[in-house]
């Protein structure tokens, strides 16, 4: 049974502008430690950050809580399996909320163009 669906789209130019004005503040706020290491070594870090931001917003929408209602950016991690498929890993309060809601499966897909990054998430019980 589907618990929630979330989608988000991010203007990559806005993320680039934020990075230009405030450095890595946004990245340190939203990325997990593992994601941070990848971000710092990416050829196109702006696209990476935009996709992670969109993904985490989509997760919060699928939970039905939004950010800061038991779901926080750095407690959601997006990684790729050995075939490159994006996967979700939850930590701390966000993981506890998923357990409380009896979530069994989490699905995510990411996409980007030169201008936009998009994420779509389905959470199942």
UniProtKB/Swiss-Prot annotation:
GO cellular component: cytoplasm
Any one Pfam family match given in the protein's UniProt record, by short name: ACPS
Any single biological process term in GO: fatty acid biosynthetic process
Enzyme class, spelled out: transferase
Compartment(s) where it occurs, according to its Swiss-Prot or TrEMBL record: Cytoplasm
Record has Transferase as a keyword: yes
Keywords: Cytoplasm, Fatty acid biosynthesis, Fatty acid metabolism, Lipid biosynthesis, Lipid metabolism, Magnesium, Metal-binding, Transferase
Catalytic function, reaction form: apo-[ACP] + CoA = holo-[ACP] + adenosine 3',5'-bisphosphate + H(+)
Family per similarity comment: Belongs to the P-Pant transferase superfamily. AcpS family.
Protein name: Holo-[acyl-carrier-protein] synthase
Gene name of the encoded protein: acpS
